[in-house]
Amino acid sequence: GGLGIEVGMEDGFVLVISPIEDTPAYKAGLKSGDLIMKLDSTAVKGLTLNDAVKLMRGKPGSTITLQVLRKGVNAPFDLKVTRAQIKTKSVKAKLVEPNYAYIRVTQFQEKTGEDLAKSLKKLRAENKFAFNGIILDMRNNPGGLLNSSVAVSAAFLKEGDLVVYTEGRAPDSKMNLTTSPENFVRNNPEKNNFLKDLPADIKDTPMVVLINNGSASASEIVAGALQDHKRALIVGTRSFGKGSVQSIMPMNNGTAIKLTTARYFTPNGRSIQGKGIVPDIVVEDGLSAIAVRESDLNNILSNPEDDEKKLKDAPEKPAKVKSVPTSDGQEALRNFKPIKLGGKDDKQFLEALNILKGIDLYKKN
């Protein structure tokens, strides 16, 4: 059993990149950017990430107490989490209203592209007519498999469109990934292309993509590709900014070294690393003032565009959010109620739906 979080290391502590939806960590109130200082009575300082992850795992139903340090909270606080078998559904889909589809992608797993295609076809048949709008929700999506992110992008872009490319010092670190089936179907791409039967109108349906500071890596690749090709409006808050490629180098003594060997770039040449994806329309979720991103971390891989005055074809960076007063961590937990994403209390989702309705009204007039 586990907790259901994507993690890294920062200053010797475990950094929560994103809690995965519907897992124990998400339900308990862990947030993107939290630092875990203790696992039960064991201090995290001095542990490797693998050692810390092993301590977080355990028998389903058993509990672990995490000591958490959160930006905007004046002292560390304890959070008890009950371990469980982590079985996440990477694609959730529904018609939120007639003619409006909502697709939630929580992670990029092996079957995510295929599940997305099935969901789109099912909703399209249920709706009977072409959609007036599609919302693709990748908030708190920590990433996953690169080929699955290409598949999700390919569902909405034209065949042959560039999704992402990488650049690094080593010649074999350079690659261009387009929406061609061979980049997301492992065996016999032409025969097994699960996107080939998608209704043609899906490619032209107005889209909004929702992101936040918990959207990292593969989800940033999808958002960047759809933004650069002007296929979708990006709504929410700036994403995490994890745009580096890691490679594992085996050593003679049976160990291995994990090295950062390249960076991801969007089709227009923007590096995701440390910058993230900036929304076309910023809609706060009430948590952005205490958000932590890759750019807030120490010793991060630099972005090659840091010295340029402006990112190529990137939207203007939104104004800085005012700092929030510190609060008591336990009080924050007592008041914590997870917002049902895609529900009536989800401000960002409701704004996305209003944007799509506005586009439809404009087209009709």
Positions of PLM-derived features:
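PDZ/PDZ-like domain micro-motif
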Residues: E21-D34, K89-K92, K196-D197
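PDZ domains, with a preference for the canonical peptide-binding region formed by the helix
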Residues: L35-Q67, S148, K242-I248
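C-terminal "post-core" interaction segments
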Residues: V91-N365
